[in-house]
Structure formats: C-alpha cells, structure tokens
From Swiss-Prot:
It is an enzyme of class 2 (transferase). Keywords: Acetylation, Cytoplasm, Exonuclease, Hydrolase, Membrane, Mitochondrion, mRNA processing, Nuclease, Nucleotidyltransferase, Phosphoprotein, RNA-binding, Transferase, Transit peptide, Transport. Disruption phenotype: Mice show alteration in the mechanisms of polycistronic mtRNAs processing in mitochondria, resulting in fewer mature mtRNAs and a reduction in electron transport chain (ETC) components formation. The modification N6-succinyllysine is found at residue 552. The keyword Amino-acid biosynthesis does not apply. The gene is Pnpt1. It is a peripheral membrane protein. Residues 1-45 form a transit peptide. This is Polyribonucleotide nucleotidyltransferase 1, mitochondrial. RNA-binding protein implicated in numerous RNA metabolic processes. Catalyzes the phosphorolysis of single-stranded polyribonucleotides processively in the 3'-to-5' direction. Mitochondrial intermembrane factor with RNA-processing exoribonulease activity. Component of the mitochondrial degradosome (mtEXO) complex, that degrades 3' overhang double-stranded RNA with a 3'-to-5' directionality in an ATP-dependent manner. Involved in the degradation of non-coding mitochondrial transcripts (MT-ncRNA) and tRNA-like molecules. Homotrimer; in free form. Homooligomer. Component of the mitochondrial degradosome (mtEXO) complex which is a heteropentamer containing 2 copies of SUPV3L1 and 3 copies of PNPT1. As part of the mitochondrial degradosome complex, interacts with GRSF1 in an RNA-dependent manner; the interaction enhances the activity of the complex. Interacts with TCL1A; the interaction has no effect on PNPT1 exonuclease activity. The keyword RNA-binding applies.
Length: 783
C-alpha cells in the first residue's frame, strides 16, 4: 500500500501498481513512493569508511523510509539515526527555515529518565550545542533563495560509552541530505581531532579525550575545503593547532568519498523547487542605478557610528523601495527588499576589496578602541567592564561552595561522560543591547552557544583544585559585533579582580572574511581578512572566525562560514591574523590589571575544614542532622563531609565563618571526656526509655548514649521496663571505651552482675576512686 506524501494516514490508499487516482499531483506522488518502495525492498545499502584505527559505518534504506532522507551512522556500538525532510511548498519567511534537533534518548544508554514523568523533556545544553554544530555544518551548502521548511532530526539509537555520538550526528545529517531529493550542495564530512602527547588522534574515544589537550571538530567539504570549525584546547601552540586542522580536513575527505560512493550506488535525483527566491537581474540593475552612489557615500563616511549608519541606510532603503514599487508594481515585495540587500552588500564589499578600507575608517587589521575597568561594585566578588568600540560587556564573578557545582545525572554521564564542573559562564544578550524590545525569559540557543564558547576560552586557565564553585556572568550592554569574544576578555578581567589564581590572562577576537568568487568556476579569486569585525561586517561578510587564548597559545575557536567551503590557506591566515590581534588586546588589558589579586576581597567567601573525632560526630551532627541544619540556617554556611573525620565549611563571608566556628566549638565542647577510664564503673542517669534500650548520661553536658537491652541484664529482655527502669533513675555501668568504627561510647550494666571486683568512680570529684566489693544491683532499685 502507498499513501500520498502529505499524510501516511490518508484514506485514499491504493496498492502499488494500480491505476491513477484521478487527482492532480497524485500520479507523481505514487510513482515517487513506488520507486522508494522498490528501492527499499532490495534491502539497505551501506559503506564503511576507514579512519585509521576507527571505522565509520554508513547505512540507509532500512529505517524511516517515508522521510526524504535517512541514514544510520555507527562507530563501535554507538549509533545515530538522522532524518531529513523538506516541504515542497515555499515558506513565507525571508530566510532559510532550517531546524536541526539532536536528541539524546535515555534508552540509548540503557537508562530510564530520572524526572517525574520518566520521559525525555525539553533539550539539554549538550543537545542544543550539538544541534548548533550540525546546523553550522550543513546550512552553508543549501542553495541561495531556497526558502522551504527543512527539518533535520538526529536520534541517538545506542551509545557504548566509548565513541562520541555528536560527530556521528554531523555525518548522519550530511548523508541524509545527500541521499534525499532536497536541493543541497553536499556532502560534508566531520571528524574530531584530539591531541595526546603531541600526536593527533582521529575520533578519540571518551577515555582518550580525558587525556587530550585538544578537542577540535572539523567539518569539511569536497576539494579539501572547510565548512565549520569548533574547538577547545589546553592553551596549545598555534602551529600545533594548524597541524590538527590539516589532519582533520584530510580525514573528512575520506568520509566525503564514502558518502559520494553511497549516493552513486543508490542514484539520487534532486527535486526542482517551485521557486528560488532571488530577485531578477532587471530589478537589481535598476536598484543599482537608484541606490549605489547613495550607499557608497554612507559606507565611506567614517563619522558614522552604528546607529547613524543604520538610520542612513534605512532612509535610502525606504526611498529605493518606493521607486521600485512604482517601476515594478506587480513584483513580489520580497524581491524588492532583497534587491536592495544585494546592492547594499555589493557596495559594502567592493569598498573593502578595492579600497582596503572599512566603513568606520579602519584598515583591515586595526582594532577598535578598547577600554577596561575592574572592581565596578565593591560588594561583588569580582567585576569588570570591557568596551571594544560600540560593544560593551559587564562581567561578574560569584563564588559559592563546591556543593553548588553543576551536577550530572547518571544518564548524562553515561551518554556524554560529563561529570560535575565547578566553573560556568552564563551569557546574556538583552534586547536593549541593540535598542530593541523582546522577551527576556529563558535562554535561547544563541545565548547558550555564545556562553559555551566564552566558557571554553576561560576554562583552561582556571586552577583545577580551586576550593569554590565559580560562576561568571556576562551581560551584553551594547552590541556591535563580537560580543562573545568581549565576554572572554571581560571574564578574564573579572576573574583576576576576584583573586582567582588563573594561569594567564585570556583575550578573544573575531576575524571576518570578504571574498570575490569566480561565477563560472565557483572558486574564490580574491579575498580580504578583517580583524575585529563590526556587526555590519559580520552580516555582509562570508565568515565569523572567533579565536581566544593567552599570549602563549589558543584555548577556544569557532568558525561560522557562510560559503560552501573555504580553503585551508585562508583559515591559516585567519589564525595568524587573529593571534597578532589577540596579543595586542592582552597588552591593553594588562594596563588595567596584569595579574590576579594576591587575595580575595574582604567580603568574599571563606572555606575551612574542621576535624571532628568519631567520638563527637554524633554530637556534631545531632539527632537527624539537627545541629547541622541549625548551624546552616543560623549562619548561612554550607557544610559537606570530606571523609570520616573531616568536614568542609563554606561561609559566604568571614563573619559567617566566625559565627559558625563559635557554634561548632560550643556543641562539640566536652571538658569531662578525658576523665573516663577504661574498665571503670560510673553512675549513669537514665534520660529516655526506648524499645531497644535506655538513653543514659554520665555527666550533665554529655550527649545521651544508648545502653542496649542486651547490656542491661544477664537475662534476655525485650523492653527496659521489664527491669523496672525509669527516667531519672541512676544505675551503675562499666565503661569499655569507644567503638573504633563509629566512635560510639560502649557501656554495659550486665557485666556488673557477674561476681568480680569493680572500681566505682565518681565524676564529681576527680581524685575520688572508690574501690568496693562486687557490685550487686537490683533490677527494681536504685544503685
């Protein structure tokens, strides 16, 4: 049976091979499904790509056959299924409506979700970040003007805890799109490169990654071109980084060849879209006549800032659109808008390519004016304001106890290997940063991605044994390009202001790219690299290449490329140009603060450890943790147990620590403890009667201890009342020291009933030791 593509539940079902249904477009849909069913009946197709000591298995044709494209990528026992579907009706949006969702299923790790509903809810940070990597790898290869809703879903089928699934998902998206009829100029291949003992490792295992100084993801296109880069590193040298990129590109070509082989075997025909949303040459030509000179005047007026330039361009836009509507009354509104965008972009880029000048008057390698300020607010643990041109970022540092670190549940640990972390950076981009209005609730994907990049930049310089959880917040107050790298700079300043002993200061910069392409060959003929790009240069350019690091090396990198591929040569030049700019920025930052404060601020938190002997642990904790809860409620401290006798105390202020110290001294004070002598007999007072025994005290300020039923009498009893014992009654007990396992006091009344000479001691007079005859205690009388 076959159904139309719009709905597999359509009631109009016909056996394959039957006559037409008499509906427009039905014959085409039926033949499409017939072809797909015939292909799938032959079984799935698969290829294996050898990546040195790793193998990548690519298969299709067995699962999700109604989707436009589907692929299963497997490495070891980790498998990811990726589907790609695109509508045949154009979207009303004026951009490429691509949605990528990567989902990690608990079942893939053999687990059940731990939330209340016991099912997957929402997307984790890791899922969002992986989705962004996939999106940035495949988006540049869609044809210009293809405005059709397209969805790529990545479903984790199985994870073995050895091979990482995110790289498989990127390759799976490439295969699914390549095998579909969706217009896409792929394929791409992706690998992860690690560096262990100076050697590059392709697609390292989770254990290998734990000892790697580099985590580099490379997405490559045919002809050894680069589509996407993302990396975090332990401050590795520039030459090592460049070598790792070249190794990654080499192995991406092997994956691309495997995908191309599979596509050739299956024989894929791409669909012809109903319409590609690009304006006609006639409209573009007329737009140039109207607006080109005006735009040139605006883009070469170096007195403009972001606001005034945008206002001038918008004024030209409105005037141009009015003329175009009069000249072409029947043309779609989108074509009019897009024609102006094309002309504005062309003028902007030609000034850079031909005159080596930028719209703010800088040359290609100059930085914007930079100013730094630290210790903005005295009550904060650390703060800094970083201003670069019209991009302004306020960063703060907050310390808390290690109990406040980000905890990973069993499922996340099983799938990603992510453990607790005590350093985090949260990035906020409020609407007012660009003079707009909008919602400020929640964190969107862009904020999450920018914050993760800045966190990667700073994480390698944070000491591993720092006794606090560190939270850096970065709030963008003004934005005109490269706010994520400004966050890395501001975060570094704030950490030093807070007294965090970072190994080195960190700075970041964004490098842009403007190219001139041969229309016949599709190759780059000429290009310009721009240091420290503006927002308008990012919008009209071909690449946003962000790099961060110290004076010594690189800690983070991210390349967002709009072209279907960039040669390695350009990437290498961008890294070199960014490294020079990074050192210039560090010199400016060092003028404000060059090293961390020698000590944290006076109002900062304090961490101390206290030793509590096993004998006093019960008193320190209290019944049901009463003393600890009271201590934390009254002083605001956080207490965590390090080992059997050691407790770590975090206090938000030195005053709180002083109060906590006095509280602990008071509850643990026991000035008569040392008088107890092993084997001596003491008079104890019953304070409570329980089913299991009686609670007794040997002296007034002592914590009551349990005298078990088995130690009350030679006879076996089930309840203390059988012996006539009452609260307030005094009995004689023999002291046998403390249990070495839990520190509890060991007392016995039973042994005193045996005929033996005993020494009766009193705690009221230290010198009094009464030697007596064998003690005989009545079960129903006071001793």
């Amino acid at each position: 049976m076959a159904a139309c593509r719009l709905c597999c539940l359509c009631p109009c079902l016909r056996p394959l091979g039957c006559g037409p249904l008499g509906r427009p477009g039905r014959n085409r849909a039926l033949s499409y499904l017939q072809m797909r069913a015939l292909w799938s009946s032959t079984g799935s197709r698969a290829v294996t790509v050898d990546l040195g000591h790793r193998k990548l298995e690519i298969s299709s044709g067995k699962l999700a056959r109604f989707a436009d494209g589907c692929a299963v990528i497997q490495s070891g026992d980790t498998a990811v299924m990726v589907t790609a579907v695109s509508k045949t009706k154009a979207s009303p949006s004026q951009f490429m409506p691509l949605v990528v969702d990567y989902r990690q299923k608990a079942a893939a790790a053999g687990r059940i979700p731990t939330n209340y509903l016991r099912r997957e809810i929402g997307s984790s940070d890791r899922e969002v970040l992986t989705s962004r990597v996939i999106d940035r790898s495949i988006r540049p290869l869609f044809p210009a003007g293809y405005f059709y809703d397209t969805q790529v879903l990545c479903n984790l089928l199985a994870v073995d805890g050895i091979n990482e699934p995110d790289i498989l998902a990127v390759n799976g998206a490439s295969v699914a799109l390549s095998l579909s009829d969706i217009p896409w100029n792929g394929p791409v291949g992706a690998v992860r490169i690690g560096m262990i003992d100076g050697e590059c490792v392709v697609n390292p295992t989770r254990r290998e990654m734990s000892s790697s100084t580099l985590n580099l993801v490379v997405a490559g296109a045919p002809k050894s071109q680069i589509v996407m880069l993302e990396a975090s590193a332990e401050n590795i040298l520039q030459q090592d980084f460049c070598h790792a990129i070249k190794v990654g590109v080499k192995y991406t070509q092997q994956i691309i060849q495997g995908i191309q082989q599979l596509v050739k075997e299956i024989g894929v025909a791409k669909r012809t879209p109903q319409k590609i949303f690009t304006p006609s040459a006639e409209i573009v030509k007329y737009t140039k006549i109207i607006a080109m000179e005006k735009l040139y005047a605006v883009f070469t007026d170096y007195e403009h800032d972001k606001v005034s330039r945008d206002e001038a361009v918008n004024k030209i836009r409105l005037d141009t659109e009015e003329h175009l509507k009069e000249k072409f009354p029947e043309v779609d509104q989108f074509e009019i808008i897009e024609s102006f965008n094309i002309v504005a972009k062309e003028v902007f880029r030609s000034i850079i390519l031909n005159e080596y000048k930028r719209c703010d008057g800088r040359d290609l390698t100059s930085l914007r004016n930079i100013s730094c300020e630290v210790d903005m607010f005295k009550t904060l643990h650390g703060s800094a304001l970083f201003q670069r041109g019209q991009t302004q970022v306020l960063c703060t540092v907050t310390f808390d106890s290690l109990e406040s670190s980000i905890k990973s549940d069993q499922i996340i640990t099983a799938i990603n290997g992510v453990k607790d972390k005590n350093f985090m950076l949260h990035y906020e981009f409020p609407p007012y940063a660009t003079n707009e209005t909008g919602k400020v609730t929640g964190v969107n994907r862009r904020e999450l991605g920018h914050g993760a990049l800045a966190e990667k930049a700073l994480c390698p310089v944070i000491p591993k044994d720092f006794p606090f959880t560190i939270r850096v917040t970065s709030e963008v107050l003004e934005s005109n390009g490269s706010s994520s790298m400004a966050s890395a700079c501001g975060g570094s300043l704030a950490l030093m202001d807070a007294g965090v002993p970072i190994s080195s200061a960190v700075a970041g910069v964004a490098v842009g790219l403007v190219t001139k392409t041969n229309p016949e060959k599709g190759e780059i003929e000429d290009y310009r690299l721009l240091t420290d790009i503006l927002g308008i240069e990012d919008y009209n350019g071909d690449m946003d290449f962000k790099i961060a690091g110290t004076n010594k090396g690189i800690t983070a990198l991210q390349a967002d490329i709009k072209l279907p591929g960039v040669p390695i040569k350009i990437i290498m030049e961008a890294i070199q140009q960014a490294s020079v700019a990074k050192k210039e920025i560090l010199q400016i930052m060092n003028k404000t603060i060059s090293k961390p404060r020698a000590s944290r601020k006076e109002n900062g938190p304090v961490v101390e450890t206290v030793k509590v002997p096993l004998s006093k642990r019960a008193k320190f904790v209290g019944p049901g943790g009463y003393h600890l809860k009271k201590l934390q409620a009254e002083t605001g401290v956080t207490i965590s147990q390090v080992d059997e006798e050691t407790f770590s105390i975090f206090a938000p202020t030195p005053t709180a620590m002083h109060e906590a110290r006095d509280f602990i001294t008071e509850i643990c004070r026991d000035d008569q403890e040392q008088q107890l002598e092993f084997g001596a007999v003491y008079t104890a007072t019953i304070t409570e009667i329980r089913d299991t025994g009686v609670m007794v005290k040997l002296y007034p300020n002592m914590t009551a201890v349990l005298l078990h039923n088995s130690q009350l009498d030679q006879r076996k009893i089930k309840h203390p009342t059988a012996l006539g014992l009452e609260v307030g009654q005094e009995i004689q007990v023999k002291y046998f020291g403390r249990d070495p396992a839990d520190g509890r006091m060991r007392l016995s009344r039973k042994v005193l009933q045996s005929p033996a000479t005993t020494a009766l001691k009193t705690l009221n007079d230290r010198s009094s030791i009464v030697m007596g005859e064998p003690v005989s205690q009545s079960s129903n009388s006071n001793p």
